[in-house]
C-alpha cells in the first residue's frame, strides 16, 4: 500500500464514518476507482479505531459520567439514574453486533465487499432512511430510552456489517422509527458503536499488516498515520454532523446515496469498474 493510498483512504474514512453514507462502502469504492484494489476489511477496521478515538474524545464527559454512574449504581440503588441505565443500554445494544460479527466475519471480509452489493445497499437503504425521516415522530429524549430501544437499535447496528448500509444510517433510522429526536438517535448510535468498533479494530490489527486473501497490506507507520488522520478528520465530522442534525433532515444524504449507487452500478454494468 502506497502512502498516497493511506492518506486518501484515511481521509475518506474520517469524513464518512459518522455520516449515513457508509464509510466501508466508500472505502471499497474509492479503492477500486482510484487504486484498482480493495483496501480490505482489516485496514477498514483498523482505521475505524481513529474515528472511534474521536468519539471517545468528543463524548469524553458523557462517557465518564455514564461509567461513573454505572459503577455507583451497581453498588447503591439510589445512584441508578438515567446515566446508569444508559450504560446498561449500551452494553445490551452491543451484544447483537458482537454475535453477528463473529458468526459472519468471513463473509464480511470477502463477498460482502463486492461493489454490486455495496451499490445496491446504498440505494436500497436510502429508502429506509427516507422512511425513518418521514414516519419518525422525533419527540423522545435520551432520558426516555428503554430496554426495547437498546435492543432494536443494537439489532439495526448489525446491518452495518454489510458495506453500503452505514452504521450511523442504520442506528439513527432505528431511533427515528422509535420516536427519538434526530440528534438523540445519533448520539446514542455513536455511543453504541464504541465497544463494537474498538473490538473489531483491535481484533483486525494483525491482519492489516499481513492480510490473508483480502486487500492490501500496510506497514506499522502507515497504520499509525492512517489512524491519526482518521481521528482528526472524524472529530471534525462528528462536530459538524451533530450540529447539522439539529436543523436539517437526512434527506440530503438519501439523495447522495442514490446518485452514488446508480453511478457505481452504471460503471460496473459498462465494465469500467471491477466489482472486486
From Swiss-Prot:
Keyword rRNA processing: no
EC number, as in UniProt: 3.6.1.27
Gene Ontology terms: biological process: cell wall organization; peptidoglycan biosynthetic process; regulation of cell shape; response to antibiotic
Protein name: Undecaprenyl-diphosphatase
Annotated TM spans: 1-21, 39-59, 84-104, 115-135, 159-179, 188-208, 222-242, 253-273
Major localization class: membrane
Membrane topology (UniProt): Multi-pass membrane protein
Miscellaneous comment text of the record: Bacitracin is thought to be involved in the inhibition of peptidoglycan synthesis by sequestering undecaprenyl diphosphate, thereby reducing the pool of lipid carrier available.
InterPro entries: UppP (IPR003824)
GO cellular component: plasma membrane
Enzymatic reactions: di-trans,octa-cis-undecaprenyl diphosphate + H2O = di-trans,octa-cis-undecaprenyl phosphate + phosphate + H(+)
Amino acid at each position: 500500500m502506497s502512502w498516497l493510498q493511506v492518506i486518501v483512504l484515511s481521509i475518506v474514512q474520517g469524513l464518512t464514518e459518522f455520516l449515513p453514507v457508509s464509510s466501508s462502502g466508500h472505502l471499497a469504492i474509492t479503492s477500486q476507482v482510484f487504486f484498482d484494489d480493495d483496501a480490505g476489511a482489516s485496514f477498514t477496521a483498523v482505521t475505524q479505531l481513529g474515528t472511534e478515538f474521536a468519539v471517545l474524545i468528543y463524548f469524553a464527559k458523557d462517557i465518564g459520567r455514564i461509567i461513573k454512574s454505572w459503577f455507583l449504581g451497581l453498588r447503591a440503588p439510589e445512584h441508578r439514574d438515567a446515566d446508569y441505565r444508559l450504560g446498561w443500554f449500551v452494553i445490551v445494544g452491543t451484544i447483537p453486533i458482537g454475535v453477528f460479527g463473529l458468526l459472519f466475519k468471513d463473509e464480511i471480509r470477502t463477498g460482502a465487499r463486492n461493489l454490486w452489493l455495496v451499490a445496491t445497499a446504498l440505494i436500497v437503504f436510502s429508502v429506509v432512511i427516507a422512511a425513518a425521516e418521514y414516519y419518525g415522530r422525533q419527540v423522545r429524549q435520551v432520558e426516555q430510552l428503554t430496554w426495547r430501544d437498546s435492543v432494536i437499535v443494537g439489532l439495526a447496528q448489525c446491518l452495518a456489517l454489510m458495506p453500503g448500509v452505514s452504521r450511523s444510517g442504520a442506528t439513527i433510522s432505528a431511533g427515528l422509527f422509535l420516536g427519538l429526536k434526530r440528534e438523540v438517535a445519533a448520539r446514542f448510535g455513536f455511543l453504541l458503536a464504541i465497544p463494537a468498533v474498538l473490538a473489531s479494530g483491535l481484533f483486525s490489527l494483525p491482519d492489516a499488516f499481513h492480510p490473508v486473501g483480502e486487500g492490501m497490506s500496510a506497514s506499522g507507520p502507515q497504520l499509525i498515520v492512517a489512524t491519526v488522520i482518521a481521528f482528526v478528520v472524524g472529530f471534525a465530522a462528528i462536530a459538524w454532523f451533530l450540529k447539522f442534525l439539529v436543523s436539517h433532515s437526512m434527506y440530503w444524504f438519501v439523495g447522495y446515496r442514490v446518485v452514488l449507487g446508480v453511478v457505481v452500478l452504471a460503471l460496473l454494468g459498462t465494465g469500467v469498474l471491477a466489482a472486486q
